[in-house]
Curated annotation (Swiss-Prot):
<dbReference type="Pfam" id="PF10612">
    <property type="entry name" value="Spore-coat_CotZ"/>
</dbReference>
<protein>
    <recommendedName>
        <fullName>Spore coat protein Z</fullName>
    </recommendedName>
</protein>
<dbReference type="GO" id="GO:0030435">
    <property type="term" value="P:sporulation resulting in formation of a cellular spore"/>
</dbReference>
<comment type="subunit">
    <text>Disulfide cross-linked either to itself or to CotY.</text>
</comment>
<comment type="similarity">
    <text>To B.subtilis CotY.</text>
</comment>
<dbReference type="InterPro" id="IPR019593">
    <property type="entry name" value="Spore_coat_protein_Z/Y"/>
</dbReference>
<keyword id="KW-0749">Sporulation</keyword>
<keyword id="KW-1015">Disulfide bond</keyword>
Amino acid sequence: MSQKTSSCVREAVENIEDLQNAVEEDCPTGCHSKLLSVSHSLGDTVPFAIFTSKSTPLVAFGNVGELDNGPCFNTVFFRVERVHGSCATLSLLIAFDEHKHILDFTDKDTVCEVFRLEKTNYCIEVDLDCFCAINCLNPRLINRTHHH
C-alpha cells in the first residue's frame, strides 16, 4: 500500500506557519531558513508567492465591489494563517510601490516594483497540492517605510 507523501510546497507553508506562530508566541529567504527572528524585529509574517505547474503565480482579489473601506485590489503575495491537511487559509498581502500606489498584477506592473506589503483581512482557501513552487520573500517588505 502506498501512502501519499507531503508536497514540498505544503511542507514549506507548514514551516512558515510554525515560524510565524513561534514569533507571535514568545539571511537568505529560503522557506526553510530562519526568516523571522525575535532579535531582528522582523514581525510575524513571512510573505510568499506560490506557483502553479505552468509557473503562473496565484492571483487573488481583495475587497471586490469595494464593500469595505479601501480599494479593490489583486495580489500575488500571501501570508499563511492556518494549515489544515493539504489545505491552507492564506491572507492577502496588498502591494505598494515606493510612491504608495497599489500595484496591479493583472496589468503592467511587475514584482520588482514592490516596495511595501501590508497585511489585510481578506483570505483565500487553497489546496496546497495544486502548487508546484513557492517563493519566500524578505519579511522586511511588510510595512516597509524607507530604503535601506
